[in-house]
């Protein structure tokens, strides 16, 4: 009897832990503030619309076809995507001390502009942008 209760508690704890971990990674790190034409956000293999006000979360893939998108992160940094662009948001970490904040974005194709001067200014050494032909770090 005690063994089955212990197993139930362990299972409940494990399920709770995985549920909590999923919610940690689902926290918004920014949102879409401008959107035109064709595009979307790929999250967990599901394509979501790129409507103004839609949340961006860690590990999202932002894509545009014949469209454009402007993502504003919580610290007011901006990522603007032009037509036929695909980027992965690999790491975003905010700290009250901007020199400790980090951002890592991986470009697959297209053209994007990252504006880091609007917010608390992430230390440039902590920004990593990788493209198919170069790495800006």
Residue spans for each PLM region:
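Bacterial N-terminal signal peptides that target proteins for export
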Residues: 2-11
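Flexible, surface-exposed loop/linker segments and immediately adjacent secondary-structure boundaries
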Residues: 26-68, 72-137
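Helix-centric, low-specificity signal for extended rod-like, repetitive segments
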Residues: 1-2, 106
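Bacterial N-terminal signal peptides
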Residues: 11-20
């Amino acid at each position: 009897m005690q063994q089955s209760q212990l197993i139930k508690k362990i299972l409940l704890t494990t399920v709770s832990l995985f549920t909590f971990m999923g919610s940690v990674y689902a926290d918004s790190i920014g949102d879409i503030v401008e959107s035109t034409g064709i595009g979307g956000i790929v999250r967990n293999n599901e394509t979501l619309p790129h409507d103004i006000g839609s949340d961006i979360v860690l590990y999202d893939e932002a894509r545009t076809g014949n469209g454009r998108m402007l993502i504003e992160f919580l610290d007011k940094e901006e990522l603007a995507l032009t037509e036929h662009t695909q980027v992965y948001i690999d790491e975003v970490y905010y700290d009250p001390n901007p020199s400790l904040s980090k951002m890592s974005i991986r470009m697959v194709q297209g053209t994007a502009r990252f504006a880091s001067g609007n917010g608390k200014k992430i230390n440039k050494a902590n920004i990593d942008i990788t493209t198919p032909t170069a790495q800006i770090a």
